[in-house]
Structures are given as C-alpha cells and as structure tokens.
C-alpha cells in the first residue's frame, strides 16, 4: 500500500489519516484492584490471556469487571496474521493440564461468563479441538452456572474438529471473519474466507440452536460495499451476534491503518447490522470479540423466545 487514503466512507468523505489517534481511542491506564487481582491469578496459574497477548485496549475496563478471555493451546501461533500481536513461530507441546488450570481460575474468580480462545495449532491433527472441549467440560464441572463462550480458529476446515467443540456444548460459538474477502491474503494469510463462512453453516447443521458469533475489524482499506456484503454473508449462514471494531496497529511491522472510523459510523453500522437480522450487534472503535460478552447471550435468547425459536 502506498499510504493512508480515504476509503469507502459510510457517512461522509473520510479525511486523510491523522498522525495521531483520534480522541475517541484514548483509554485509561489499567491498575484497579480487580485488575491487579486477575493479573496475579493469571500468573499464578501459568495461564495466558488474549487481552495481554493481543494488546487489547479494553484490558483495564474488562479486568476491572473480572472479565477476561483466556488463551489456550499455548501462546505461540502457527500463523502470522498481518494485524495480530500474538507471537508467531513453532509452538510448544500441548499442556494437557491446561483445562483444569483454566477452570480453576474461573472458579476462583467466580465468573458468570467465561471466554476461551486459542492460537492456531496447525501442527496438531485436530487443531487443538480436544483441548477446547476439555476446557468447556471442566468449566461446567467446577462452575455449573458459568456461561462458556469459545472463540475458535478455522481448524483448516476439519469438520471432525469442529464437531468435537460443538458437542461439548458451549453457550456461544465464535469465529472471527476479521475482514472482507479481497483483503484476506494480507490480513489472514493461511485462511480462506469461504472456509470460515462454511464453519458457521456446518455448526448450525450440527446444533440448530447453538448461538453463533463473529467479528470484523475495520480500517484495513475495505470498501463500504465489501463490508456490508461480508455482514450479509454472515447472516446468510445464520450468524446471531456480530462485533465490529477499529483496527489498531500493534507495531510498525504490522499492517498500516488505512482509516479511522468515527463513533457515528459505528453507530450506523450497528443499525445496519440490526436491520439485517443480527440478534445483537456490538459496534464501536474499541470493541473486540469479547467486549460486553456476558450480556449478549441473554439478549439473543430473549429475541429467540419472541420468535418462538428455543
């Protein structure tokens, strides 16, 4: 890319990308008592969180509310996505005790909703799906009232791996599309747009009432029509929940930010998504996959009851 340009504005013509972040992207530095408590627990249990590994801007707010997204299957990813701060390389051996440590941490925190995600483990035949299932089941054993959301990789299209996770019965199955198909080679090398879409169709066939969720990051240079088409594609495979957030560049080695979307544009995207039929749309500059995750399942289930769909 030659440099920042105005790309596909939703409401008005975009300005050339400013040198500084706009004011709506500023966040308070973390340091609350709950934040420090959770940080100590994660360290004591030898766990990883995507909040830390991916430099999430909401870490202070979420950890203050004792909400965290636990990262399983290690902290080294076999893929090297252009936007992601997680370390890429040769991963370590799987830790079979990890499900118990994660579940114990969730129990100690008294969480009502737990989010579990992972690095890609293309070195494993099942992509790590058995560990995902073990984590879900162990959380159910130790914290029966805790909702469980999993943010899974594409498992390279392995249907048996997906079934392993679905049959463990998470409350929400999340898989992020991240971007529009034209930008997949840059943003998600090693992944395929249609394969990720098909994951949702397969999951729906496996479990008709499973709540599904996906996320899109904006600011890579996508056009308006491409973004709206990706949202429509997700509705076509009956995705229930959509998150939309601004791309923030982790380092100079990552993809550049082409445009900052305004809060007003995110509000418009939320309204458009709701009009398309998503049961919940979380949209905002700092929104990430697990942002306000706890309340989303209640809203989806309430709308399903109104529709007569359990």
What are these regions (language model features)?
Residues 85-101, 108-160, 165-201, 213, ...:
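Core AdoMet radical
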Residues 50-62, 73-88:
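Local cysteine-cluster metal-coordination motifs and their immediate loop/turn environment
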Residues 52, 72-73, 117, 151, ...:
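A secondary-structure boundary/capping signal
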Residues 80, 124, 183, 252, ...:
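Glycine/Thr-rich phosphate-binding loops of Rossmann-like dinucleotide-binding domains
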Residues 1-69, 100, 104-107, 134-146, ...:
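Auxiliary Fe-S-binding modules of radical SAM enzymes
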